[in-house]
């Protein structure tokens, strides 16, 4: 009997029969075997079920005392000496090094790709690591069984094998922070000490561990919160809902291995149907019977594979679960009590282990083959025979070895020399590593048998870069190329099948932009010879100026002056103005200009250089502008105003404008009122002039207050006047008989508080000359380019414009503007100060048009380029024409050699190749050569009999007694690789040659642990979903090249096509039968699709109600199993019923598609039970039923969709939830725990359960009986004689409750 069996034999159905008050305590059997963690757990459980809490506590106490007693008798400690490194370690490492050396050699010969080399290295180290671990354990076992380290790890006191392995074996492979495995393992252990490199690599993992833990805690806490919120209102409210429904429990499998056994899943359940023995037809258990450990074992031993049990998923209790459907309360192995808050228990049971789930374990390079394929090694030496009908296709393993892949299940036979025969079954997809008739040694690897869907292994496409290890010229060997152009017009080149890219060694020079080679292919150059040169050319020509600059780091500058102009008549002085320096220009005519462009800056065409300081054209306040005879044009930027073309008079009608933004209540004057200067027109605003007020307001907000100066005359009837408002009146022209102005005025009609009136406003006149009074400077250079300073008058306003201002306004500006002749307007002029030739104290302004050319500084040769040398070809003051060369930069060869690789044609030459003596190698021969000139040889190939080639390369010449090789390096690229170079390209060392596209195995751990649980419970669409079968049928599978063509022939003969996305691998074979909703490719299933497929399928044969229920049932099963798989894979045990409660909350709603005659609206989410009741009512009244689709809600969505808006609002999106509840006038019935906690009432669970339940079901007053005020007497045997304890597991309490019931 297994140890577990021995214990759980005791976990009998004592609730049903055993230890009533008068039954003697059952005898205690003597047990004599080793007790580990698991056995200890079973022991306590057994004692608890058999003898109750008090005795178990006593026993646990005794065990503790026992443990401490012996733990303190003696002790072990570990010293450095105890860390014994297995002696065979060195030899194993050497073996691994040799294997890897061989793989690297194959890689340098171009026989395997970079990916295959990497994979081989990783797998080799993993295997060796395991072997060292075994050796280590054997070493301890045989030579030093009492070693303290070994004892600790072995007994489970501290540490485990993998930790000991790091102490005395080897630390093994490490992953980098991106999760890629570094192919340099840590060969040492902590006992020997790590090298510096190993230490750095090793510290990656430690940091990652800390960060992960911190993130995990937060994630796990949030998951628990969402779970509690979704299931907090699930409380046991009924004893039995009486449902006939149930769910089928069976073994939970993952591939071939049992994850949870049926026996384990049955314990604590209530049966929904009688269980009948399959052979004897004897009834083993009846419906509604609880399953304890004994019964579960009996059922499992009878060979029954499926049992129908009651479950929270099928419970029909309204908004809760009943005791029968929930089953045992796991805390004390008997039926759950009424009022138990099972929802919260479920949520915490699922959420709590969250922290133990890894975020995602490191993604190990390849999976160790052990998991995916079973390795077959020859049990004896012999010959392999294949049967005639064995169908295989050639296949390349992930280590780059040639093998055969079996297409149809079959077997192979191994025949020994002494007539031994052994046959091995080969399943479809297995790999044969030997050929028919091959001789094999004992323990040689013959084949890897693929296990049917063993681990949920899937592959993903990944890319790996192939990098050139040497500089040189590209040569493709037997590499057919396919060209693809995408929609954007980008062309990619891919390899159609595998081939070689050779890099022929040579020195590659990168040429700078604009460099031209001065040598031809085949030229011989010496060190220091010029290979290429760039010329520096002037664009515009002019006079050379070489500025004095000490800063030669960035190279020297050469300036070429195209044109210059000096203001001979004006001198420059500096004033400081408001703490800033200001440059002023005084002309000989006494005018002063402010420089707008400071010396040292550049000025473009039509930009302002200086502006005249002039107060003649300054007004006192704002006003109206009128032009008389002035013509203007807009030139240059808008904000500079209008240029005056024709002079004339500018008429200015002053007015004072206050722009305000205040309430109208603050206004102190009326519209049209005449005010004196200094009046407060608005609070805190005073006017400067006397005049008539105009108030501009909008929506009782003041915008502007305008004060118009002038003389006001009241008139009775302004309409009779001949002069219109807004006209200019000349002096002496009468307006009315009584009014004759003596100067030019502007007439305006106004409405005053006293009545209509005329306002005569004074007009100021400014005379503007045709030409400004400033001379224009001009100069023309030898090249014919001219530059000048032109004086311009600009008016900032247009005719009739109102200028809003309180203070003074400039009405005319006189500016000096730079003009460069039109053929080169993009040039800019530099502003410089120069000393006067006669008087050094006087500084003049000079404008120069410069072209600045930068000379490259000389560069010493490095790996990728030769040294450069720049020669200047001009002197200070030289006059040069445009297009002249002023300097040449030469690129010099580093070593002597022959020039190659200059491509003829239109393409720009960016690189030049020189083949030097370093790139050639001479091999002396003893016999005739068996290679030809031009042949590509790999390292190790024979050049002549018995003479292997020391290098890979190309044969350049064969002379008597020697072969001249040009070194080269072959790189194997696999089919489908993306090529980054073309044939004949020149590459530097470190350039990318190609991207290898390969499939790498994704182990189940990619989305594993917490992220996967969250994805499931939030019902999210997985990233790479599998294809699901929509109807049952038979698979028909054919291949179009690499692309699978997948069809399913359904029962009625319909053929349905399924499209398989690239990167998805099939998990079905030709002719395989599939059921509805079965996955056809690898990857996680999308639960929403699953629900839809099941619903559509069942609807064709059953009614909507039945179909919805069955579809939801299937999806519920899927969820329970998936969640269990994740937790079990991490070694966490959770009872199914907890997951079922949460899943029930996720799958209880349907979406209304059409309300029919009901009061439901389309799109509404309703409980399935509710809508089925409504439809039943409709069937009686003859109305049209509501149509609906079952939906799946993630836990967050389900929490927000509960009946209780208080609970939803306290979870997330408070404002939205409360607003909607208010608009819809919702009521909260306070059924759950959370609502009641928030309101501050007693919660309806535990003792508070009865409070509310009784209020609900209170009897009529006349039926009420007198209740005894005290409890009925205690049964005498409640107090046990021996340990004087009331024990809550003694069924005396049950009797108490029964008495209560009888009295009620």
From Swiss-Prot:
**Which Gene3D superfamilies does the protein's record reference?**
1.10.132.30, 1.10.150.390, 1.10.1790.20, 2.40.50.100, RNA polymerase Rpb1, domain 3
Q: Does the keyword Transcription apply?
A: yes
Annotated Zn(2+) binding sites: 241, 315, 322, 325
GO biological process, alphabetically ordered = DNA-templated transcription
List the catalytic activities from the record. Answer: RNA(n) + a ribonucleoside 5'-triphosphate = RNA(n+1) + diphosphate
Q: Which HAMAP family match?
A: RNApol_bact_RpoC2
The task this protein performs is described as:
DNA-dependent RNA polymerase catalyzes the transcription of DNA into RNA using the four ribonucleoside triphosphates as substrates.
As for family, the record states:
Belongs to the RNA polymerase beta' chain family. RpoC2 subfamily.
Q: State the oligomer form and interacting partners.
A: In cyanobacteria the RNAP catalytic core is composed of 2 alpha, 1 beta, 1 beta', 1 gamma and 1 omega subunit. When a sigma factor is associated with the core the holoenzyme is formed, which can initiate transcription.
Q: What is this protein called?
A: DNA-directed RNA polymerase subunit beta'
Q: Quote the gene name from the UniProt entry.
A: rpoC2
